[in-house]
Amino acid sequence: MYIIVGLGNPGKKYSGTRHNVGFDVIDLLAHRLGITVNKLKHKALYGEARIGGEKVILAKPQTFMNLSGESIREMMQFYKIDPENLIVIYDDIDVKVGSLRIRQSGSAGTHNGMKSTIYQLQTDAFPRIRIGVGRPEFGDLSNYVLGSFTKDEIPLMKESLERATLTVESIVIDGIDKAMNRYNG
C-alpha cells in the first residue's frame, strides 16, 4: 500500500497557484483512476484506489502548507505505512517551469511543507516528486508561489502535471529507480 500526498493550501483562493501543483497532480491522478478525493480524515481530503493492483491512498492535507507533516504523520501511523511507501508531490522554485525532479530521499530545501513533513516523520527517506514552478526574477517569493502561471507557462505545466501522474504510477508499479530514470528532467 502507498500513500500519495500532494502538498498545497486548502481553499478556492489557492486553487491554480504555483504552490498548489501537488493538489493538482492528486486531482488529475484521481480523475485518471476514476475516484474522488472527498473523504475527510487525518486532517486531509483523501480517496482510495488501486494502481497496478496495489492499494493507494490519494491525499490532500487540509492543514495549510506549513503544517502538512501533521496530516501525513497521522495517515502513516493509522495505515502503518513505512516511509518508502509514501510519495510526496510538491512545487519547487529551484526547478525550471515544467521540469520534474524525482528523488528517493533528500532535504526539504526551502519548502515549508516538506520541512514540516520531514520534522513530523523524523526522516527524509521517502520518495518525492518536485514539480518545477521556476523562480521570480525579482519581487516577493511568497506572492510568486501564491500566484498563477503565465499564459506561456500553462502548456508546460499541463504536460508536467501529466508526467507527474505517470511518475506516481511508475513508482508504484516499477519502483523508484525505474521511475527516476524514465521521468527525471
Swiss-Prot record:
Q: Which residues form the active site?
A: H19
- One Gene Ontology term of the molecular function aspect: peptidyl-tRNA hydrolase activity
Q: Looking at the keywords, is RNA-binding present?
A: yes
Keywords, A to Z, come to: Cytoplasm, Hydrolase, RNA-binding, tRNA-binding
- Which Pfam families does the annotation name? Pept_tRNA_hydro
| Residue runs in coiled coils | none
Its annotated compartments are: Cytoplasm
Site positions (Stabilizes the basic form of H active site to accept a proton) are D91
Q: What main location does UniProt list? A: cytoplasm
Tell me the HAMAP family matching this sequence. Answer: Pept_tRNA_hydro_bact
Q: What's this protein's family per the entry?
A: Belongs to the PTH family.
Q: Quaternary structure per UniProt?
A: Monomer.
| Name of the protein described by the UniProt record | Peptidyl-tRNA hydrolase
Originating organism: Alkaliphilus metalliredigens (strain QYMF)
Top-down, what is the taxonomic lineage of the species of origin?
Bacteria, Bacillati, Bacillota, Clostridia, Peptostreptococcales
Q: Which gene encodes it?
A: pth
